[in-house]
């Protein structure tokens, strides 16, 4: 509807961003890297229309953590590559320093979004915001409690998390 309205009003638009909840509103389905079949029954068709009919690209937000009911969470959990400390929204963050976590992350991103026609993704919250993350002193405390990453202490390497995730 937004894109159609912009086109009807002759307002220039090259890209539209859906920030979150394309996976659903339930926190347990957070960032499953799949479209909710109820709210997005045919994402490939919608994206195709955005491209061919409206000449607009689609960007989706993708997060480094996952709700407990998602396949990616279950796969990351089985591989033991999730930090123990939950974020402000209650999901757990992947140890993206671990090659196994990188592979799982990319496979879900590729299969769940890229193959549907999504043009780009916005890697949101790549500085994992743990509980009370809005307060710097609390963020530091929780970061130190996150434990060990594949390459060492989370407290020591957390600042490079965004860089590693974008690779």
Region spans (language model):
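Carbohydrate-interacting/catalytic domains
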Residues: 1
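Ser/Thr/Asn(+Pro)-rich, low-complexity disordered segments
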Residues: 4, 8-9, 27
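Aromatic- and carboxylate-enriched substrate-binding clefts and catalytic-loop regions
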Residues: 12-167
């Amino acid at each position: 509807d937004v894109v159609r309205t912009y086109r009807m009003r002759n307002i220039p638009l090259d890209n539209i961003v859906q920030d979150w909840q394309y996976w659903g509103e339930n926190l347990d389905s957070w960032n499953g890297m799949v479209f909710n079949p109820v709210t997005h029954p045919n994402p490939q068709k919608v994206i195709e229309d955005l491209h061919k009919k409206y000449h607009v690209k689609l960007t989706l937000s993708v997060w480094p953590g996952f709700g407990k009911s998602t396949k990616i969470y279950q796969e990351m959990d089985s591989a033991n590559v999730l930090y123990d400390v939950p974020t402000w929204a209650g999901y757990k963050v992947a140890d993206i320093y671990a090659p196994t976590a990188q592979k799982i992350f990319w496979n879900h991103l590729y299969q769940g979004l890229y193959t549907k026609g999504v043009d780009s993704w916005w890697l949101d919250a790549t500085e994992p915001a743990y509980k009370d993350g809005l307060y710097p002193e609390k963020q530091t405390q929780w970061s130190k409690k996150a434990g060990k990453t594949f390459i060492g202490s989370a407290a020591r390497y957390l600042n490079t998390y965004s860089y590693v995730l974008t690779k």
